[in-house]
Amino acid sequence: MSQLFGDPQLSASDRDLAALQGSWEQVSLEADGISNPPGDLGLRGALTTFRDNHFVVRTTEGALLLEGTFVLDASVSPKAITWTDSMGPDSGKQLPAIYKLEGDLFVFIAADEGASRPSMFRTGPGQTMRTLVRRR
C-alpha cells in the first residue's frame, strides 16, 4: 500500500488494513476455552502474512496451513473482521470475528459461520469461538 498509516483522508478500516500488512507470528490460541489446543491452527510460531485483503498462514517450516481473504469494518465497536478461507474445512464460509490492533499485537476472536459475531474479547467452553493472538 502506498498510503500512510496516519493519513487523515483514510477511513479507520483503511488505516487498520495498512497496519496489518506484513508478517505476524502466532503466540497463542484459545479454542472453546482450551489454551493452545493440539492441531494445525494451534501451532505457536505459525506465520500469517497479510497482503492487501489476502492472508496466508504457514508453519514455522513453511508448509501452507490456510489462506483466504478478509474484510475489516473499524467503524463499529468492537471492530469487525470477516474471514473467508479459500481452502480447508471452512473454504468459502464467512467467519464473523472481532479484532483489535494494539502496537505489535493483533488479537481476534472468530466464530463459526452462521453464528453471531462475538461482542467481547472473551471466550469460554461451549462457545465454538477461537481467540488468536499474533505478534509482529
Over which residues does each language-model region extend?
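N-terminal helix-cap/turn-to-beta initiation motif at the start of protein domains
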Residues: Q9-E25
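Contiguous, well-ordered beta-strand patches that form the walls/edges
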Residues: Q26-G39, N53-M120
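A short beta-loop-beta micro-motif enriched in histidine and acidic residues
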Residues: L41-R44, P125
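N-terminal beta-hairpin/loop module of FHA
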Residues: F50
